[in-house]
């Protein structure tokens, strides 16, 4: 008996061990990312030809302890390589594993290469050449926990490359993954009708058809690793190939299983047909170009096994949640009695199906860890799902009802108000209900959802489910395309992380506010470039700016400065520490046709700039951060602790009877009024005057003060 190792992705070991047992292997032992087994040479060939799960079959030549470079060298040198391959053959080494004395795989490969070359030389034989690409003889070495395994890559190129697929779709599924799905779902033991409504390039259906008609997965491969092996028995191999061809020919004619595949992309369906034709199973599969929500249910019950789109593959998660909910609705309505198996990397998408899984497994799709869930579908009604209603109210009426009702009520009130006010960006929901802790802002035809950090006593699973329900129901509640929903997570700000990018891609819009135009960037940063709660504060700045010199400190994107300029300010100076936001402020001025020299922009640490400037102003708007410990600032800043010295430092910048509009977002902020009055300030709280209607539900969103200095 010979010793072999069947390599496979992690998570496939159990299915692979069952398959090897069915094929006749003995001494089966599961390991990490593979299975050891024993077999005769003929059985080794058979397993290589018939394994649907394995990635590679390794003929093990040596296995033993290895604790040093010398032991590794000696292990390789001790093999009689002239028994394995001819010196005229090229060879290569694939080394896997690190740890101990091996800090990189190249080191291990070079040690084995040196040992092989030295062994040929010491046996008075010319040394074979190394070929990095398309070597005749590929040596495979695995190092793990002080053990080295050296062997021949018996199978050659990865076994998932069956030979029937030349080109793949946008998000291909490996053939051995598809085979594993079919086996673990239970379909292989009960090959009834099979449907894949997201068939892509057809991999699941083709693999299933090959199983059903008894076709060896390696039958279409052109190359195997043992072909240049000196112990190769071509007679055995040719007999196995002839047997496999005969079995496939008989199996195709006898196959009664029906296969159905569809995809929304006609080009991908054409590719699936080509792949099926290459595999010799096209006549068994009924392909169609169809939206998954329009798929007709076959007359006979069976299995629906699929790998639908998910965030890493296609589309946005928000839009996909809508799709998954509709799919779950369709399954329950039309697929009663069917078995369902779904592969997905996002458990939140699977939860949107609103189906209870009979079994949940982990299964890798390449480097991506996925969930593979099995369901038995029980019919709940007989209505058909209309995919054209995907965003209309009623489709999701059975979940998050209080949230949906509140959002509908809010939007009905706010739409008329916003139109009257002359604004097209506003907040429609702000954690109104304790179970749904999100803020929802509408920017023209887009919505940004900000998820607040949940209390520690709320289980993460509950928080995720509630957020999923929000994302599913919101498009229908307010009549918006789910692709136009952006999700962000808002946590307590620390230092400068409001400046950090959260996504590489941009989504820029132009919004209008009381006649002013502002650029928005909905995706790239946590904030969008416009603080909606300060809308009336900006308007107030504009109303107070006519014929006055205005200063905007901690100016962000300069929106208050724009209002000041449009309000007729004599001059406007905009100061912010961020180069990004200073340039953004300049863009906002350009959008409004404000290109005069009297509008100046300063990128500087505001605290330092206040100390050094000699400019005077009639109106100062200052909206400092609640807390900051930026690297560009010498000391940290806390608005509660430091607001008095900050405001006192502005006195020298004020003209007689000058005013300061001071705002911050510190909840439970307490103004040191007596200390400020001692500095000759008149202090007035103007929260009610500056809190917009869309923020009335959350009066603590900010606090605003008007300070007038007596001179």
Swiss-Prot record:
It catalyses: guanosine(2445) in 23S rRNA + S-adenosyl-L-methionine = N(2)-methylguanosine(2445) in 23S rRNA + S-adenosyl-L-homocysteine + H(+); guanosine(2069) in 23S rRNA + S-adenosyl-L-methionine = N(2)-methylguanosine(2069) in 23S rRNA + S-adenosyl-L-homocysteine + H(+). Coiled coil: none annotated. Keywords: Cytoplasm, Methyltransferase, RNA-binding, rRNA processing, S-adenosyl-L-methionine, Transferase. It comes from the Bacteria. It is found in: Cytoplasm. GO terms for cellular component: cytoplasm. PROSITE patterns: THUMP, UPF0020. Gene3D superfamilies: 3.30.2130.30, RNA methyltransferase domain (HRMD) like, Vaccinia Virus protein VP39. Signal peptide: none annotated. SMART domains: THUMP (SM00981). Residues 43-154 form the THUMP domain. The keyword Transferase applies. It is an enzyme of class 2 (transferase). The keyword S-adenosyl-L-methionine applies. Its EC number is 2.1.1.173, 2.1.1.264. GO terms for molecular function: 23S rRNA (guanine(2445)-N(2))-methyltransferase activity; RNA binding; rRNA (guanine-N7-)-methyltransferase activity. InterPro entries: 23SrRNA_methyltr_KL, DNA_methylase_N6_adenine_CS, RlmKL-like_Mtase, RlmKL-like_Mtase_CS, RlmL_1st, SAM-dep_methyl-trfase, SAM-dependent_MTases_sf, THUMP_dom. Belongs to the methyltransferase superfamily. RlmKL family. NCBIfam families: PRK11783.1 (NF008748). Specifically methylates the guanine in position 2445 (m2G2445) and the guanine in position 2069 (m7G2069) of 23S rRNA. This is Ribosomal RNA large subunit methyltransferase K/L. The gene is rlmL.
